[in-house]
Design a protein with these regions (language model features):
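Helix-loop junctions and terminal segments of transmembrane helices
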Residues: 28, 57-74, 256, 260-284, ...
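Hydrophobic alpha-helical transmembrane segments
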Residues: 148-197, 366-374, 385-406
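Interhelical loop/hinge segments that connect adjacent transmembrane helices in multipass membrane
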Residues: 1-6, 145, 169, 173-179, ...
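Transmembrane helical elements of multi-pass membrane transporters/channels
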Residues: 9-24, 154, 179-195, 209-279, ...
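Signature of the first transmembrane helix
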Residues: 5-63, 91, 95, 99, ...
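Single conserved hydrophobic/aromatic residue that forms the stacking wall/gate
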Residues: 432-444
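Alpha-helical transmembrane segments of multi-pass membrane transport and lipid-handling proteins
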Residues: 25, 84-110, 267, 291-342, ...
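Interfacial/gating helices of multi-pass transporter permease domains
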Residues: 28-52, 173, 211-218, 240-261, ...
């Protein structure tokens, strides 16, 4: 019954909100004939910069959402109201900065188009607040429907706009831009009455800036922590853009990364569904149960990754109806394996969140992000965009070695993992599995 409950919640919180993405995957055979590596290059650069700003925008204040829900059962809505107001203010200020950054990039695009690209693509940054609040609230309440239905409707609206723009109007990358803007507007609008009226989370303007300063003192380490995750996923394309790698090459990498990253739906759905269990088992010091949940997530992810990686060339032949992108299947397979250790990150970081040791989170993700940047800077001028695939894999997997040399994680990981050599076993299993489906294509 417990396993069935987990699977139901995993489907509700993880798969259902991503259903539009899965439908979009099915639409790729229809739209890829009308897309080029240049279109994916533009889209890859835009998503890298926008992802960077959207990650910074919460200012780490989401740290207080989960903890306050458990610790202040009668007053958590007041704190959440302040946080959502800070989110709105942050979105406005960072949108202005983002527009200026985009105007300085994309030198291959004329300045008039750059301005339109910047204005349209900043909409998700401007309106991120409601969605972030909902993504924290409903997993904690264990009620997926309010989150799922609204997220799904917003995603379907955006996906429909993208499809119509690309398939019927041959709009190329503009179709992606229109789609994400519509998704953000619809989602923001749908969550307003739900959060403000039904849940009683109303924006509270707090003129006592000292409270915000005090909160930021605790939350600021989460900014580089969250930023580190973006450095892992987006820094490569930003560095390629700064090195003036052609948008066509960036587009090939972006296409492979997009396809490989679909595997995170499984990891995300499992972990989000398990959030209440993770909190309860660790807080109750039931560490063997915590470890069992980790094994369940880790081996489910490994099995899914291996299966998808084996079939990736065939998936490309069916889904990507464009010869220009067929070589990207090798990139997609490796990106799948880059994500295989994400359950370890989620379970390890959860401990630091519970203990409110936010500064320690910097090790978990900022260091791998720094490794990715370092390798990209060194290798891109020598090997081109292909080197980015290898640097992404190496940097993602460095998460697994952190408990061996960082005292904080060495101590706390041993509490729930037991012997740390179990991490080595999992790492070796991943290495063995990656060799089979990808070795011939890695050599080529």
């Amino acid at each position: 019954m417990f396993l069935i409950s987990i699977l139901k919640k995993a489907f509700g919180f993880g798969v259902m909100p991503k259903l539009a993405s899965l439908v979009n995957l099915l639409l790729l055979p229809l739209i890829t004939p009308f897309l080029t590596p240049f279109d994916y290059g533009i889209w890859g650069v835009i998503t890298s910069y926008s992802g960077l700003f959207i990650t910074i925008a919460p200012l780490g204040l989401n740290l207080f959402l989960t903890n306050s829900y458990y610790e202040y059962s009668n007053h958590w809505r007041v704190l959440w109201g302040r946080v959502i107001c800070y989110f709105y203010l942050s979105g406005i200020l960072l949108s202005i900065v983002y527009i200026c950054v985009i105007m300085g990039m994309l030198s291959e695009v004329c300045i008039q188009k750059r301005f339109l690209i910047a204005m349209i693509s900043c909409v998700p940054l401007l309106l991120f607040g409601n969605t972030v609040i909902a993504q924290h609230l409903y997993p904690l309440k264990g009620t997926p429907k309010p989150l799922v239905y609204r997220t799904l409707l917003g995603s379907i609206c955006g996906m429909t706009v993208s499809f119509v723009s690309i398939y019927f109007f041959k709009a190329g990358y503009w179709g992606f831009l229109f789609g994400v803007a519509v998704t953000a507007i619809v989602s923001f609008t749908l969550f307003c009455p739900l959060l403000f009226k039904k849940e009683g989370i109303k924006p509270i303007i707090d003129r006592k800036w000292k409270k915000l300063v005090d909160m930021l003192k605790l939350s600021w380490p989460l900014i580089p922590h969250a930023l580190g995750f973006v450095l892992l996923s987006s820094s490569s394309r930003i560095i390629m853009n700064l090195y003036q790698v052609s948008l066509e090459d960036i587009g090939l990498f972006s296409n492979g990364y997009m396809m490989g990253d679909y595997i995170t739906i499984i990891t995300t759905s499992l972990v989000v569904a398990l959030v209440p269990q993770l909190q309860k088992t660790y807080r109750d010091k039931r560490f063997s149960d915590y470890r069992s949940l980790y094994y369940f997530c880790q081996f489910t992810t490994l099995t899914a990754v291996f299966t998808v990686a084996i079939w990736m060339p065939d998936i490309y032949r069916v889904v990507i109806r464009n010869e220009s992108f067929q070589s990207c299947s090798a990139i997609a397979s490796i990106i799948c394996f880059a994500n295989v250790l994400l359950p370890f990150y989620n379970f390890t970081s959860n401990v630091a969140f519970i203990k409110k040791d936010s500064k320690q989170l910097l090790w978990l993700i900022f260091m791998p992000g720094a490794v990715n940047i370092f390798l990209s800077i060194i290798l891109i001028p020598i090997l081109g965009y292909v080197s980015v695939v290898y640097s992404t894999l190496v940097s993602y997997w460095t998460i697994a070695i952190i408990p061996f040399f960082v005292p904080y994680f060495h101590k706390n990981t041993k509490v729930w993992m037991g012997k740390l050599n179990r991490i080595i076993v999992i790492l070796l299993l991943s290495l063995i599995h990656i060799s089979e489906p990808t070795r011939p294509r890695l050599i080529s």
